[in-house]
């Protein structure tokens, strides 16, 4: 009787141990499968993150005053004090321009592409319209200012000479008078187009250039140019280097 009980106990214990082994083995297989799936999912996620999205062309807006215009190009003196030359295609929308693309017009330029500094080689102009914000100077004054800025930027002494009224004040610390176009052209180029003068005039923001009684100043500060209203239009009446 006792022997039978002992034998039954041994059988029951063996069955318990066997079932435990099976459960443990299944658990290990499930863990391995789960780890493998997680690893594969992680790899897939890592792959998705590493995919590079190609850069998209940017859209931009620039405000400025047109200082030079032709059928295929226009040069803008922007409200940031930069001079940018844009190419113009036949499909440019100009329906928002009252007087067309012309020197002295304050405009808003909508473009697509990459604008690097003053270079617009990779830019396509989509639309040119009248600017909502307006300069304080008259259109006649803006046309004159644009011609002067271009002559100074290009260091074109001959053109600049013809944008002056004589006798002309040429103040380099000593008050000097220049009597004629020929005398102005005979001046040393380095004396006329100093680095500081070219920088000051070229960075003029025509939207904030103030007019006074009979003219305006071109330049961020000294050195600057005094531009006055004369019987022959707006002309430079003074160069002030100090």
What is the predicted function of each stretch?
Residues 59, 79-81, 220-222:
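Glycine-centered tight beta-turn/hairpin loop motif at sheet-sheet or coil-to-beta transitions
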Residues 63, 185-242:
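Exposed beta-sheet edge and beta->alpha loop/turn motif
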Residues 103, 142-143, 159-211:
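Short solvent-exposed beta->alpha transition segments
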Residues 147-159:
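Short helix-adjacent coil turns
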Residues 91-97:
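Short alpha-helix capping/helix-loop boundary micro-motifs
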Residues 81-91:
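A short macromolecule-binding patch
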Residues 2, 7, 15, 19-20, ...:
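Short, flexible, surface-exposed loop segments at domain boundaries
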Residues 126-150:
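Short, low-complexity N-terminal intrinsically disordered segments enriched in polar/charged residues
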């Amino acid at each position: 009787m006792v022997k039978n009980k002992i034998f039954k106990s041994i059988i029951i214990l063996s069955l318990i141990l066997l079932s435990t082994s099976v459960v443990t083995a299944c658990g290990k297989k499930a863990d391995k499968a789960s780890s493998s799936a997680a690893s594969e999912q992680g790899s897939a996620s890592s792959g998705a993150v590493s995919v590079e999205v190609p850069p998209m062309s940017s859209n931009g807006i620039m405000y400025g005053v047109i200082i030079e215009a032709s059928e295929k190009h226009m040069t803008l003196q922007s409200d940031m004090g930069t001079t940018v030359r844009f190419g113009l295609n036949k499909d440019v929308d100009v329906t928002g321009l009252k007087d067309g693309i012309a020197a002295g017009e304050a405009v808003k330029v909508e473009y697509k592409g990459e604008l690097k500094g003053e270079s617009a080689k990779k830019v396509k102009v989509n639309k040119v319209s009248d600017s909502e914000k307006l300069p304080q100077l008259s259109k006649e004054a803006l046309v004159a200012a644009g011609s002067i800025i271009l002559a100074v930027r290009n260091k074109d002494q001959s053109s600049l000479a013809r944008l002056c009224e004589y006798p002309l004040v040429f103040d380099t610390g000593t008050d000097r008078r220049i009597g004629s176009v020929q005398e102005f052209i005979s001046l040393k180029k380095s004396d006329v187009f100093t680095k500081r003068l070219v920088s000051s005039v070229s960075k003029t923001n025509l939207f904030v250039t103030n007019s006074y009684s009979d003219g305006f100043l071109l330049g961020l500060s000294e050195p600057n140019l005094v531009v006055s209203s004369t019987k022959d239009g707006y002309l430079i009446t003074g160069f002030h280097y100090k």
